[in-house]
């Protein structure tokens, strides 16, 4: 299992939100490229970059910053936030991203996901499944749908999706621990899963590592790294030392 540091960008700054709430924003740096290089220097093998302006409004005003991040680090970068049509997907790859994360569009227009998989390959397309109380959330987590996350995942599998990013938004930035029950349920799909939301301790990651056999191959860590709850390099050393 790999640990993927999160770099969330809003209005040009590296920020963290709580439960996706803009009013609960903390700015950690005015230089997201520096932050990306920092996590790379601490041993990150992949980065998770989200354009929050894109997620909330659909306008990708941070494109130049994300392009600079991709150029500044020699590790794969997955990029999400407001990617809702084929032009935006192409744009993400053109600026150097290794993976495109699709969220709202996968719910509203799954045909675009199918087209993206056909054009770029299923290994390049990640679908974000964001949920609150088990229900799918879309449009920057502002709208909660009546659809169960597990139902959406099964539909995604039918159209060729192989990798999902699962976030329990009630845990995001709240340090309450990952949604192990939700991950276990989604793992029944046979998908490759990136776990996100709630990680506070290295022990949380050690427990997530036990789900590797169920398809959880990566964990995104955000707030805990920025508040220095633990060191990225310590977490990587601990997780890599565990033999499953």
UniProtKB/Swiss-Prot annotation:
Domain of life: Bacteria
The protein's enzyme class: isomerase
Compartment annotation: Cytoplasm
A single MF term (Gene Ontology): 1-(5-phosphoribosyl)-5-[(5-phosphoribosylamino)methylideneamino]imidazole-4-carboxamide isomerase activity
EC number(s) on file: 5.3.1.16
A GO CC annotation given for this chain: cytoplasm
Keyword Nucleotide-binding: no
Keywords assigned by UniProt, alphabetized: Amino-acid biosynthesis, Cytoplasm, Histidine biosynthesis, Isomerase
Name this polypeptide is given: 1-(5-phosphoribosyl)-5-[(5-phosphoribosylamino)methylideneamino] imidazole-4-carboxamide isomerase
Organism ancestry: Bacteria, Pseudomonadati, Elusimicrobiota, Endomicrobiia, Endomicrobiales
Gene name for this UniProt entry: hisA
């Amino acid at each position: 299992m790999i640990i993927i540091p999160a770099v969330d960008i809003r209005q040009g700054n590296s920020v963290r939100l709580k439960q996706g709430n803009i009013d609960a924003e903390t700015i950690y740096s005015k230089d997201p490229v520096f932050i990306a290089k920092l996590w790379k220097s601490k041993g990150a093998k992949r980065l998770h970059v989200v354009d929050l302006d894109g997620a909330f409004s659909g306008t990708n005003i941070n494109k130049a910053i994300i392009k600079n991040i991709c150029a500044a680090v020699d590790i794969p970068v997955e990029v999400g936030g407001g990617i809702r049509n084929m032009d935006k997907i192409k744009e993400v790859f053109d600026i150097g991203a290794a993976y495109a994360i699709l969220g709202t569009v996968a719910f509203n227009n799954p045909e675009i996901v199918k087209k993206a998989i056909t054009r770029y390959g299923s290994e390049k397309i990640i679908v974000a499944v964001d949920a609150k109380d088990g229900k799918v959330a879309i449009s920057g987590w502002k709208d909660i749908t009546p659809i169960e996350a597990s139902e959406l995942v099964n539909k995604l599998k039918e159209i060729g999706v192989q990798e999902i990013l699962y976030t329990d938004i009630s845990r995001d930035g709240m340090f309450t621990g990952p949604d192990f029950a939700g991950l276990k349920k989604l793992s029944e799909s046979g998908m490759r899963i990136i776990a996100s939301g709630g990680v506070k301790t290295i022990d949380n990651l050690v427990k997530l590592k036990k789900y590797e056999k169920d398809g959880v191959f990566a964990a995104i860590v955000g707030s805990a790294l920025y508040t220095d709850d633990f060191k990225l390099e310590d977490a990587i050393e601990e997780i890599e030392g565990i033999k499953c």
